[in-house]
């Protein structure tokens, strides 16, 4: 599958740009109001007790602000944050090196935490529960366990697949938050704030149009904003008006619902099955894509907006999908 403009993952060239547009304070962070409210209370209480925060887990589709909100937590707690990802922690020694370099109340953010190996999880358990690192030296009867005390710290785990977390690991998080898709009005506000940082004038209706096509995801909204800005520059326009915005979005292949070719191909596959469940492996083979990408990158938004149902036997298109694609459903055959 070719690179999608609505890809939920951060593209290589976007890393530094994302940081520059990242909110630094609660008042700058738009959306996720319930999560923000709970976190503000927890942070205030922890600071009054002069303790570290409880370990917390953020889960949900990519691009909804798990990393951004973790940076704000660190800023509010007036402490440092160490960012890593589970695939980078291959050996227990890798984790030990990270943990022993943490200071009191520091935050360790582990992205894709569901990908930690069982051996790494075993090292992490006493660190989370007792702030203790158990290191085994040697093997067999001569093996010895050395216990190293760690300063109190907060582990923030982020995952797109909460169901793949082991129960022992999940149970060790004191707080767990499901990140929700954003409303068009929230995304429009994010877009307008980002446009100010980019020194780009944008019409209200242009921000609304980009927001409508951003699949409820700030990362996609900001990406589309920057691509539309490119079109405006080429057209020698200092203002992103509705005409330029519509032209750019249509050229980028993102329709008014935020769907691209991959989404429409996926939905067509289900709709043409005429109510019969389609297995994930069949979908992956037909689209020439791996199952994980389909589950993480295509299905969440479609599922949240009622375009498919997941059953034990496979995926089924809903009447909403048939109406969108103008593919009629076959009427059930009866004897009368």
From Swiss-Prot:
Residue positions binding ATP: 21-22, 63, 66-68, 129-131, 172, 182, 219
GO cellular component term, pick one: Holliday junction resolvase complex
According to its UniProt entry, one GO biological process term is: DNA recombination
What CDD domains does the database record attribute to this sequence?
AAA (cd00009)
Gene Ontology molecular functions: ATP binding; ATP hydrolysis activity; four-way junction DNA binding; four-way junction helicase activity
State the residue spans of region: Large ATPase domain (RuvB-L). 1-182
Q: Does the keyword rRNA processing apply?
A: no
Q: What class of enzyme is it?
A: hydrolase
Q: Which cysteines are joined by disulfide bonds?
A: none
Give the region (Head domain (RuvB-H)) as residue ranges.
256-336
Q: Where in the cell is it found?
A: Cytoplasm
> Which residues are noted in the entry as DNA-binding?
310, 315
Q: Which domain of life is it from?
A: Bacteria
Enzymatic reactions: ATP + H2O = ADP + phosphate + H(+)
Q: Which SUPFAM superfamilies match?
A: P-loop containing nucleoside triphosphate hydrolases, Winged helix' DNA-binding domain
Query: Mind telling me which InterPro entries this protein's record contains?
Result: AAA+_ATPase, AAA_lid_4, DNA_helicase_Holl-junc_RuvB, P-loop_NTPase, RuvB-like_N, RuvB_C, WH-like_DNA-bd_sf, WH_DNA-bd_sf
Domain remark from Swiss-Prot or TrEMBL: Has 3 domains, the large (RuvB-L) and small ATPase (RuvB-S) domains and the C-terminal head (RuvB-H) domain. The head domain binds DNA, while the ATPase domains jointly bind ATP, ADP or are empty depending on the state of the subunit in the translocation cycle. During a single DNA translocation step the structure of each domain remains the same, but their relative positions change.
Q: Which family does it belong to?
A: Belongs to the RuvB family.
Give the matching HAMAP family: DNA_HJ_migration_RuvB
Matching NCBIfam families:
PRK00080.1, ruvB
Q: Which PANTHER family match?
A: HOLLIDAY JUNCTION BRANCH MIGRATION COMPLEX SUBUNIT RUVB, PTHR42848
Give the protein's recorded name.
Holliday junction branch migration complex subunit RuvB
Annotated gene: ruvB
């Amino acid at each position: 599958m070719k690179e999608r403009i609505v890809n939920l993952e951060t593209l290589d060239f976007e890393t530094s740009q994302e940081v520059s547009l990242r909110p630094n304070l609660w008042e700058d962070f738009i959306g996720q109001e319930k999560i923000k409210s709970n976190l503000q209370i927890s942070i205030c209480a922890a600071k009054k007790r002069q303790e570290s925060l409880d370990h917390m887990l953020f889960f949900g589709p990519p691009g909804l602000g798990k990393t951004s909100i973790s940076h704000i937590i660190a800023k509010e707690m007036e402490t440092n944050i160490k960012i890593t990802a589970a695939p980078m922690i291959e050996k227990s020694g890798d984790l030990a090196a990270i943990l022993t370099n943490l200071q009191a109340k520091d935050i360790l953010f582990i992205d894709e935490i569901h990908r930690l190996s069982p051996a790494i999880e075993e090292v992490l358990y006493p660190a989370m529960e007792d702030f203790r690192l158990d290191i085994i030296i040697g093997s067999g009867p001569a093996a010895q366990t050395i216990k190293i005390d760690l300063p109190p710290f907060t582990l923030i785990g982020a995952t797109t697949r909460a169901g793949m977390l082991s129960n022992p690991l999940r149970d060790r998080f004191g707080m767990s938050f499901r990140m929700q898709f954003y409303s068009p009005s929230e995304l429009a506000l994010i877009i307008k704030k980002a446009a100010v940082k980019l020194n780009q004038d944008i019409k209200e209706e242009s921000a609304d149009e980009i927001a409508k096509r951003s699949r409820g995801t700030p990362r996609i909204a900001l990406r589309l904003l920057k691509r539309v800005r490119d079109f405006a520059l080429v057209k020698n326009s200092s203002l992103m008006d509705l005409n330029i915005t519509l032209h750019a979005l249509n050229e980028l292949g993102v329709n008014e619902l935020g769907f691209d070719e991959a989404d429409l191909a996926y939905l067509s596959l289900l709709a043409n099955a005429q109510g019969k469940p389609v297995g994930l492996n069949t979908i992956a083979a037909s689209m020439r894509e791996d199952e994980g990408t389909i589950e993480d990158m295509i299905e969440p938004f479609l599922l949240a907006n009622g375009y498919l149902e997941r059953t034990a036997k496979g995926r089924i298109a809903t009447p909403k999908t048939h109406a969108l694609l103008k593919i009629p459903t076959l009427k059930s055959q009866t004897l009368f």
